[in-house]
Amino acid sequence: MQHNKILIRQLGLQPYEPISQAMHEFTDARDEDTLDEIWLVEHHPVFTQGQAGKAEHVLVPGDIPVIQSDRGGQVTYHGPGQQVMYVLLNLKRRKLGVRELVTLLEQTVVNTLAEYGIESHPRADAPGVYVGDRKICSLGLRIRKGCSFHGLALNIAMDLAPFLRINPCGYAGMEMTQMRQWQPEVTPETVAPRLVANLLALLNHPPHEYLPQQ
């Protein structure tokens, strides 16, 4: 078996909770022989509170559910038109530290955006990726048994208004942006393969396989 191989699942538009549960079950059940996986998904509208999340950062949730998550970080919003990429990696096997993985994911996004002519950067004081002062990608991870789960959420072509109902990632007045502002035709379907390709490049091009959407 090629332990280095990564399986890539395109899950489409899904509610948050069943995918979160499946991700936990996958991580709990995995052993040394379990292949790493990348899950690509868009979520129905939902606010998720990270482990460090404070209730006061959820300002006016209205009709959008607020769900507690065990990822790192504070509150964020997921909705259609945002590409979520969950990274289910055995860090020990890949000889990656947690900080290295965060840097690698941020660089994956920076490299992907550069392909679309969008200049972006990470910030030392606030994980994620930014275009100027505006946030375009949120990042939150959890490590269990030396394996990562959760991942990143890249704003592509979505309704950004729900972000006004929260202090994104715990920062009052944090402005959000998305790829559509620079590339009007862009969609999660077109960006996802570039995101995966850039992640695989930074992981030194491991063998990989796209699984058919179920």
UniProtKB/Swiss-Prot annotation:
Protein name from the UniProt record: Octanoyltransferase
Species of provenance: Klebsiella pneumoniae (strain 342)
Localization (cell): Cytoplasm
Coiled-coil intervals: none
Entry EC no(s): 2.3.1.181
EC primary class: transferase
Alphabetized UniProt keyword annotations: Acyltransferase, Cytoplasm, Transferase
Active site: C169
Main subcellular location of this protein, as a coarse class: cytoplasm
Pathway named in the protein's UniProt entry: Protein modification; protein lipoylation via endogenous pathway; protein N(6)-(lipoyl)lysine from octanoyl-[acyl-carrier-protein]: step 1/2
